[in-house]
Amino acid sequence: MKNLSENANVDTKTMPAADVHLTLTKAVKYQFGNLMLILRDDNGNSVQVTLKSTELKPGEYSKDQMSSAYVTISGGGSYRNLDSDDPGSFTVKYDEGTGIYIIEGVLILQPNASYPSVNVVRFEYVGAI
């Protein structure tokens, strides 16, 4: 293995610790005054976020930009609300040339006695919306 400085085309970044990592494969958005974004996979996992905006723009979304959100995790609880003090955040990137979004983040769930080991969810989505 070469020294890190000798490796070309390698990006490294520190990822926050998470209890669950979801690679979501489907996305839809709805406009009901505010924007609702739903990301899900074929295993019943999903992230649903209602934003305090009418458009999904590139940038970071945290407590101030989210009006409500919940996460459903197969084997980890349905409709798990986010922590009201620190719900976590996610980042949206968009490539206008390809129409592809990259959405990734870490959400912190309210504690749940039925699922005490699932409190932090890291997720990512790459695709069109």
Model feature map: region roles:
Residues 1-129:
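An extracellular/secretory-lumen and virion-surface interaction module
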